[in-house]
């Protein structure tokens, strides 16, 4: 514990003791006697010795301006409740927000299972003590494999954006190429993460979309594919909601050039949509948040990566893969890591890519959700979402000056509403709706300025006819 707490030591002696309230009650290591004992334990002469390798220009030269501490639990609780009371949650307001985090029904059993003490950790587990967790994650992988019609699915990575970045780097390693084509309808936030993952050695180039259908522009794609192209990455449905029925053509184009087809998909759509593996995808990735997870922002949603069971793909997974095998006892099976030597946990500084296990718990949650729903349940949810989204789009377009930004787009649960002819900004419409406790869609005017005043609306199985009618009347 003493060694782990060294990160809390502050250079320059004990600046916290110089504050008018003395030693900070939340930072035990600010006590001079505690610091001295820790330094003796590791044989260091001073706190400064611990930071000798850090250049002077990067060190903080002054005391941290921390706020006055709240000394009692009652004061702290009251302060936090006051801060949080400034928020309006989706429990209080009617939400049509999506764009990467959407509101779906979370069956009570999902929360019940993921809060059990034997599962309640973000970590994936250890082979000698976590057989139950390994089995649960193996079951998740199997269920996702069935949903995606793919052979291999990883233990969840941090989120869908990391899964996308990792899938692209896998494709680059497999092909030995450095040119990546990405659809320009990808979320600006996700594209930033992809660029960050790839900026050291890969070149990201965007492919235009059709302004009427929202689909990938095949002519532009053909002109940009070359023998240096490692992969084409597109999303189906896209961030802007459009379903692309050209998946097979896109995959054929990149395959002819010797590259890899990567498709990101919303897993809850697969009860009614064909999985990407059916139209040529080599790597399928995405976010499992719709599968039994509450909306949240600031933590891992859980991302998945799926491929065929081919060595050239499996060897490039940086994340953990769990398998099943017979034990020495007849009729008994064990669950454990496959090809562990390819992971960053084994290769450390020589690994191809680093990955953590911060979202493994969500894999168990998604496994519970999928086992509860089954194929028929997923189909029912998909059909319900389709019907409700179509009704919402139709009702909104009945308003004066309101239309679909992509009039010929096929969409699943999200669609772009064009407010340009209303003479009002999305920001002003959102503000008016918020006063009525309604979140009216994601403002696209910054991320996609070419669309002008447009908003991305998300409708799922939780929305009722009355909910849709309410937002329409409020906008009117």
Q: Language model features by range: what are they?
A:
Residues 1-15:
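Short, Lys/Arg-enriched N-terminal segments with co-localized hydrophobic residues
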Residues 24-28, 40, 66-70, 130, ...:
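Hydrophobic alpha-helical scaffolding
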Residues 52-139:
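N-terminal entrance/gating region of PLP-dependent enzymes' catalytic architecture
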Residues 26-27, 162-334, 401, 417, ...:
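Conserved PLP-enzyme active-site core in the AAT-like
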Residues 291-400, 404-408:
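Active-site C-terminal subdomain of aminotransferase-like
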Residues 13-31, 38:
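Charged, compositionally biased N-terminal leader segments and the immediate start
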Residues 127-129, 145-165:
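Short loop-beta-helix segment that forms the pyridoxal 5′-phosphate
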Residues 376-470:
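Conserved C-terminal alpha-helix-loop-beta "cap" of PLP-dependent enzymes
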């Amino acid at each position: 514990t003493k060694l782990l707490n060294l990160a809390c030591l502050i250079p320059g002696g004990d600046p916290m003791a110089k504050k008018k309230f003395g030693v900070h009650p939340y930072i035990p290591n600010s006590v001079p006697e505690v610091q001295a004992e820790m330094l003796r334990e590791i044989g260091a002469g001073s706190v400064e010795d611990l930071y000798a390798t850090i250049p002077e220009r990067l060190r903080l030269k002054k005391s941290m301006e921390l706020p006055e501490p709240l000394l009692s639990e009652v004061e702290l609780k009251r302060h936090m409740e006051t801060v949080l009371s400034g928020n309006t949650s989706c429990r209080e307001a009617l939400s049509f927000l999506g764009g990467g985090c959407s509101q779906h029904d979370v069956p009570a059993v999902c929360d019940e299972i993921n809060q059990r003490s034997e599962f309640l950790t973000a970590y994936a587990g250890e082979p000698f003590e976590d057989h139950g967790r390994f089995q649960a994650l193996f079951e998740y992988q199997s269920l996702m494999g069935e949903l995606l019609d793919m052979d291999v699915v990883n233990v969840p990575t941090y989120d869908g954006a990391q899964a996308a970045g990792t899938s692209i780097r896998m494709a680059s390693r497999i092909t030995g190429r450095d040119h990546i084509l990405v659809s320009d309808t990808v979320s600006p936030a996700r594209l930033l993460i992809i660029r960050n993952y790839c900026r050291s050695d890969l070149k990201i180039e965007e492919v235009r979309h059709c302004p009427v259908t929202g689909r990938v522009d095949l002519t532009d794609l053909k002109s940009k594919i070359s023998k240096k192209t490692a992969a084409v990455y597109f999303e189906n449905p896209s961030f802007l909601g459009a379903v692309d029925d050209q998946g097979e053509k896109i995959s054929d184009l990149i395959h002819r050039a010797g590259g890899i087809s990567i498709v990101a998909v919303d897993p809850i759509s697969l009860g009614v949509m064909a999985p990407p593996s059916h139209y040529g995808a080599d790597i399928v990735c995405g976010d499992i948040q719709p599968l039994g997870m509450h909306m949240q922002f600031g933590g891992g949603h859980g991302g998945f990566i799926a491929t065929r069971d081919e060595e050239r793909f499996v060897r490039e997974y940086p994340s953990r893969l769990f398998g099943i095998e017979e034990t020495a006892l007849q009729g008994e099976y064990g669950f454990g890591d496959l090809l562990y030597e390819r992971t960053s946990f084994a290769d450390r500084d020589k690994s191809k890519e680093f990955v953590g296990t911060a979202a493994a718990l969500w894999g168990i949650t998604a496994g519970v959700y999928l086992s509860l729903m089954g194929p028929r349940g997923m189909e029912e949810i998909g059909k319900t979402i389709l019907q409700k989204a179509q009704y919402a789009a139709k009702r909104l377009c009945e308003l004066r000056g309101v239309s679909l930004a992509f009039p010929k787009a096929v969409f699943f649960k999200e669609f772009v509403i064009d407010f340009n002819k209303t003479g009002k900004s999305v920001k002003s419409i959102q503000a008016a709706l918020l006063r009525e406790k309604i979140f009216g869609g994601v403002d696209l005017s910054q991320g996609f300025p070419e669309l002008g005043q447009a908003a991305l609306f998300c409708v799922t199985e939780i929305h009722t006819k009355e909910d849709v009618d309410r937002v329409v009347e409020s906008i009117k």
